[in-house]
Amino acid sequence: MADFGADEASSKSESPEQEDQGSEDRSLLHQRLAIRELIDTEVSYLHTLRLCASDIRSHLQQLPPGDLDILFSNIDDIIQVSSRFLRGLQETACREEEQAHLIGNLFLEFQEEFEQVYKVYCANYDQALLLVKAYQKEPELQKEIQGIIEAAMPQAGPSGLSFFLVIPLQRITKYPLLLQKILENTPADASAHPALQRATSALQDVNGNINEYKMRKEVALKYTKVEQLSLRERLARINTHTLSKKTTRLSQMLKQEAGLVSRTEDKEFDDLEERFQWVSLCVKELRNNVVDFMGNLEVFLSFRPHERSLDIPGGPAEQYCSLARDLQLHAFLQFKQRLRSLVWQPLCSLARALAGPQNLIKKRLDKLLDFDRVEEKLLDVGSVTWEEEAARHEYQALNSLLVAELPQFNQLVMQWLGQILCTFVVLQRDLADQVLRRAESTMALLPHHHVSEPDFQKLLEHTLGQSSSQLRLFQESFEKVLPPSTTQPLLPGSEHQMQALLTRYGPEKLYQVSSNINGTGTLDLTLLRGQIVALLQNKDTKGNNSRWLVDTGGHRGYVPAGKLQLYHPIIPSEKELRGQTGTHEDSWLPAPEPTQLSVPTVPTMSQVVAVYPFVARSTHELSLQAGQPVTILEAQDKKGNPEWSLVEANGQRGYVPSNFLARTPSPTPWGWNLPS
């Protein structure tokens, strides 16, 4: 009896220790079961993802273009991350004592990757569900999709595509629960406890960040939708709420501009927006340049001299026509097609991609006004309404989205822009190589193919110089035998300039430009047809008589001598002065240089015509057409203003601007003589 009592007392004293040991064993068992559940479910999850990406997606190619990208989003990225994560989980099995600690560190290692891949998928999930609902409204398509799913995974049931699409969302939200289960069965003094605790908190933060990102994307999607609305539809959307909101924002903006209230400043966003606007300007400039280049290319291809009959049988001319025809039909056509598909179309897509962020930036400015107003009210009153709090959070979400996404967007646009420029350069180089290859066989037949490039350049310059001299001689010969060219009317507003040149240099030095002159050198002038200049020297510094030094009254420079005609003022006779009350301006008519050849000339008489069309704005004015002859009754209005002239045309009288009129010569019928 004494021994039995001693054993009983001993068993009672050992029972608390045994209970503690049993509790630890149960916790360890539950921990290992939780770890086993984590690994087994990860294996099943990855298998389902691969099945969805391979068997199901590959058999849904009959869906409209682009739908597969929306349905399955970045599932390939999720598979890649999950594969590496599962491999890491399986490697922890060989170190059973440290397995819980290794799993906690593994989750911390994959924290950022989980957030990056799952936030994209979760943000696109709602759009994928909209597509699934749209497919359900088409019985034949839905039946075909259901057959594909049942063949791949019979346990999916009637839920169809939505069964697979929701799996990644369920998995990322289950990670914190699985970690929490492992953590609960890990002693607080165990070495794995801190790592598991950090991992659980990190995965909870990941889910919170994903939800916040999804909310931002929903706000962005709301304001990036481009709606093509007519004016009637836009007016129909205006209501009292819209007017009140616009008025409040305008009032807030005016108070900020006046300095009555403060404005929220965000230096980080301002820098990003400036960068975005600069990138947008680069895209716009490049697009305009490509448009001009393609237009010039079309003009270049429209000229086809090889299709003309040159009347030069055989020789280099025939070889050139053959080469030009080959380039026109093959090399240039291929270059044009590649330019459109590889440069123009991507550039247009890039320009369209800028519209969404641009709309978000504009909408952010509106939301910033609402935010500042709510913040001001919150400081004054201490509380805001539910709608005002929602507007406040909407601005914060929109601003956070832009600050987070604009740097990456700007970088991608610059990379895209650089690729387009590189492609354009490569296309130019390929075209040059094609032209050289096609010209090699023809070049061997040309008379100067054996000449070196420097010698060929000298030969080319010499030939062009000779041709230019011959053309100049031909031009001078034709100018001597041709009748005098038609006198050009004076440019509007050039009368005072002509008077100054006449006073300074005299009538014998006055010349009028017979055709437009485009200066190409640093000392060359660009002049318009009809402009009056004064001759300073009839040759240039090298003694070339074909270039004259002239004065326009403001600038001095060289112009081609062949484009100048000598002019003298024509003084109207007393009869003409009596026949007209006055003229608005003195007119200067050309007198051709006397030539040695006897050429019949046509006598001319002075005539006042409208140089430009004029539309009357009142009953006191007279409408005129360009070139319409008029009779000047008074060279000023009733107040003596010479800028208006009273004229008569077609039996009607009225005032017209004086600088719209010019005196031009008109041929006199043969046999008539001007009165002496």
Swiss-Prot record:
Domain of life: Eukaryota
GO molecular function ontology, one term from the record: guanyl-nucleotide exchange factor activity
Domain SH3: 506-569, 603-666
Domain DH: 30-213
Cellular-component GO terms for this entry: cytoplasm
Pfam families, per the entry: BAR, RhoGEF, SH3_2, SH3_9
Function: May act as a guanine nucleotide exchange factor (GEF).
Protein name: Rho guanine nucleotide exchange factor 37
Species per Swiss-Prot/TrEMBL record: Mus musculus (Mouse)
Gene: Arhgef37
